[in-house]
A protein has these predicted regions:
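One-carbon transfer enzymes
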Residues: 1-176, 181, 226-229, 235, ...
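Glycine-rich beta-alpha junction loops
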Residues: 141-144, 188, 199
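Short coil-to-beta-strand transition motifs
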Residues: 159, 188-194
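Short beta-strand segments
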Residues: 182-183, 194-197
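Low-complexity, glycine/alanine/valine/leucine- and proline-rich hydrophobic stretches
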Residues: 198-228, 236-237
């Protein structure tokens, strides 16, 4: 597309700064990028604004879409704000809210927010250009501000001792990437699995937590207050399969367990 690209490994590199200054930009827009040094975001006449995939000050951090679903939120949105010295704390320009559907996975929500965000960036640029922007300061701290830290292997593991809704939300909040995972013991063999599509059923039962109950077409796992029905799973060393396909060539022992 004949775009002029600067891709520095060090954002404070003097050569990069010089080339950026030569562009003489009067406004900079940032989407899904690392923290900028002050010399960069202060450079344009009208500053630098960022698009963030949450309703700030909620879910500051690297994974706002994931954590909104993991925490069971029923709404989220996008925010444009002017960048300042800290991460995701600058003055808010515009916000747009949308619902989170009960069975929505993070990949689906990401795509809806992507289009919403593009429209909000366009609106923000137009209002800055026309001198029509009125900003709002963010609340900087407080017990109600939830964060969205980077996702690591440790916080993607399913805790089968959690309640039904928490497990369900964690799995869909990590689907398709990076994926919620669990240890599984079957026929005396321990392995790792990633679980993707699931459904839930809230019901009292007497099964032990984590026990796997297969049938001809589905796989369910007992949790404290119901069952998680696994619709899509990837066993380590195998490809991702829907439950019915897995059950065609894979058998579970009577004491098979997720843990």
């Amino acid at each position: 597309n004949n775009l002029y690209l600067l891709q520095p490994s060090n954002l404070k590199d003097e050569g990069f700064i010089s080339k950026l200054k030569l562009l003489n930009a009067n406004l900079q827009v940032v989407v899904a990028f690392r923290m900028l040094p002050k010399i960069v975001w202060k450079m344009p006449q009208y500053g630098t604004f960022n698009l963030h995939a949450s309703l700030l000050p909620l879910y500051r951090g690297a994974a706002p879409i994931h954590w909104a679903i993991i925490n069971g939120e029923n709404k989220t949105g996008v925010t444009t704000f002017f960048i300042d010295e800290k991460i995701d704390t600058g003055k808010i320009i515009f916000q747009k809210e949308i619902p989170i559907y009960d069975d929505e996975i993070v990949g689906e929500l990401h795509d809806r927010l992507m289009y919403l965000g593009a429209d909000l960036v366009s609106k923000t640029v137009t209002h800055i250009q026309n001198g029509e922007v009125k900003t709002q300061k963010q609340i900087q701290d407080g017990k109600n501000i939830k964060m969205a830290p980077k996702l690591f292997t440790e916080n993607c593991k399913i805790n089968w001792g959690d309640n039904l809704d928490s497990i369900y939300n964690r799995i869909r909040g990590l689907n398709p990437s990076p994926g919620a995972w669990s240890k599984m013991k079957n026929n005396g063999v321990e392995t790792t699995v990633k679980i993707y599509r699931v459904k839930k059923e809230k019901i009292k039962h007497s099964n032990s937590i984590g026990c796997i109950i297969p049938s001809k077409k589905n796989i369910k796992v007992a949790v404290e207050d119901g069952y998680i029905f696994i619709e899509e799973i990837k066993i380590s060393g195998k490809k991702k399969l829907d439950a019915a396909s897995l059950l065609n060539g894979f058998s579970f022992s009577s004491d098979a367990t997720m843990y």
